[in-house]
Amino acid sequence: MTDPRIIVAIDTFDLKKANAIVDQLDPKLCKIKIGSVVFNALGKPFLQEIFHRGFKIFLDLKLHDIPNTVHETILGFHDCSIDMLTVHLSGGEEMLKKAMLAAQIIKTQVIGVSILTSLDESDSLNLFNNSLNDQIVNLFKLAKKIKIDGIVCSPLELEVANRILDSHTIRVTPGIRDIL
């Protein structure tokens, strides 16, 4: 069986609604994405329930903290059978290395978030003293250096990603469609 390429986000913290969405899905066809709002509301038991229903889990918490905290946070998911989880590439080389080490232990993939799509050119200049495109290039180069498992990026960044990253690096691009 091939790995599902579609990732469906559960974006409700109402357990009944979340289960109603999951009930409509087939684990052979998609993975389930759980973001921070849903995770904070429903916690590990919901992750474990989704896993036991046969789904691969994409935990989108966008971790960004000191290296040891990110490492320990990832290790804390050892009992959740997570397929992929996100960290911010802007957390830096040491944080990413520690994330990768922890991910190897719990057998998950680390997916690096480049630039949030809510940020624009002005934000990039203010935050990074760099143009948006140059910052994305820098982050993708860091991802390649660290040998991160994958990246999350805007579809508009795929051309740059394809130029910089290895062909085996996973690319996740968001698309939003309500199903309920």
Which residue ranges define each predicted feature?
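N-terminal glycine-rich anion-binding loop in soluble enzyme alpha/beta folds
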Residues: 1-24
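Conserved anion-binding
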Residues: 2-3, 65, 69-160, 164-180
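Catalytic domains of carbohydrate-active enzymes, especially glycoside hydrolases
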Residues: 24-34, 80, 143
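Glycine-rich, proline-tolerant flexible connector loops at the mouths of alpha/beta enzymes
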Residues: 32-42
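Pyridoxal 5′-phosphate
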Residues: 46
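Short, structured active-site "lid" loops
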Residues: 51, 55-58
